[in-house]
């Protein structure tokens, strides 16, 4: 029965995981390792089972920074930004821990080519400079922090001072999108992501902040 806890955690079967933890009377925990050091915590993180992660951490003393045999934390195994946010912002995950190869979770995500939004979120959280430019575009695409802040200030000024009267539909749509970003829960991160997408679009000749109303489909994030 106990051997199935890793499968149950991978499947997000919360009831099954809880049953195993209770029935084992302490023999199995969220930190219990298989032969590779893989734990239920790693499994739940890898498959994005948020409720299970919260349950194991909050009710069963789960260690969100437990290491497997490769020195990976559950955060190293994450594949989506929602799970990363939960681990870092709610469960106390340490994004500075390096595995046996010397990689932080951010380093690992970049090497493995994980989801772009996940990489960007961890880059910002880790305080890593965008040395490769906007979303990986090199050369003139690099936006330093000072220029980025100027972009942000310009956006805010435009929203506060430019009238809507007489604006075309594309401009109004862009304005509404920016207003939603500014008033959202993660305004700074979302605004930075929006600006980087717009600059990248301009670089690729697909439009500009002044001329194109929408972000490319590939840049839209849920």
From Swiss-Prot:
It holds the Pfam family Ank_2. ANK repeats lie at residues 1-29, 36-66, 70-99. The keyword Repeat applies. GO terms for cellular component: cytoplasm; nucleus. PROSITE patterns: ANK_REP_REGION (PS50297), ANK_REPEAT (PS50088). Transmembrane segments: none annotated. It comes from the Eukaryota. SMART domains: ANK. PANTHER family: ESPIN, FORKED, ISOFORM F. Present with 784 molecules/cell in log phase SD medium. This is Ankyrin repeat-containing protein YCR051W. It comes from Saccharomyces cerevisiae (strain ATCC 204508 / S288c).
